[in-house]
Amino acid sequence: EEVQQAQEQKHGFTTPNWCYSLYENALRARAGRSYKDHLLHIGKIYERYSENAAKAPEVSWFPNKMSAEEIAVPNFTPGNRAITNVYTRQCCAFNEVDMAAAALVTSVGMAKKLGIPEDKWVYVHGTASTEDTSLMSSRAAYHQSIQHHVGFKKVLEMARKTVDDISFFDIYSPYPCMPQLAAEALNLPVDDRRGWNLVGGHSFHGAPGAGFGCLMVVAMAQKCRENRGQFGLVNTNGGRITTQGYGIYSTEPFPQSVWQAPIPGSYAYEVNTVKRPIFNPVPSGNCVIEVFTVCFGHEFA
């Protein structure tokens, strides 16, 4: 494993912009799209993200609504250069910003004791978490996320809901491949009318690294308060699509007698036992390229 890690570091497999681009290229190839068509495809996905960021200019890093071309076509907008062959600067995460959020998680009894008004209460109906290998070259596939297939299934099972019962989604989206991977796992169109975010994602709202997960939970709590009795699903992400968290929320109380979060270790095998490629430190012979990306510096973009 140390040799494999060293090889990945040598070839840039630890750089998020490059790693997420591998998934994006795989999704493009899977769909059979040309590069031009795929750039417009991801631009249209992120149009809705920019719309949500524009609705909250007081907290968004880029609060201006942008078109698909402005977002995803290199240099359509001055300064929006190509980072890789599928991502422009505006498609990438902006995760070094000064932001914070806080959520108070407690029991009904303690909430009453603290005098928190009941119209502020939001209940957790389901939780789940999954983890994949951190080794990019050992991922089972790049056009889908086995973690999502397991995680979404488990969180919906705990909440006793189906995907049709969910009114709002907020999918952790540092790059456009993330809502597409979620759509694939949930068997939904990527342009689902409910959308995949509430506040604009990493690229438009901006986020303090993985701390964006807390911002998402706070935004979902507010959304649930405004739409009482409806359900929202939040997905968080860490590393390079390495760790995933899932939560379902609503102002509707969950029967306390049956609330029991499954232990992640009880279903980890569903991710861990999937067939994976075997690393060969001394390769020889013919090969098939599974996925690739092209990375640009300032002078070539």
Per-segment meaning from a language model:
Residues 167-168, 231-233:
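Conserved beta-strand elements of the Class I
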Residues 1-103, 107-110, 116-207, 222, ...:
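Conserved "HGTGT" condensation-loop signature of ketosynthase/thiolase-family condensing enzymes
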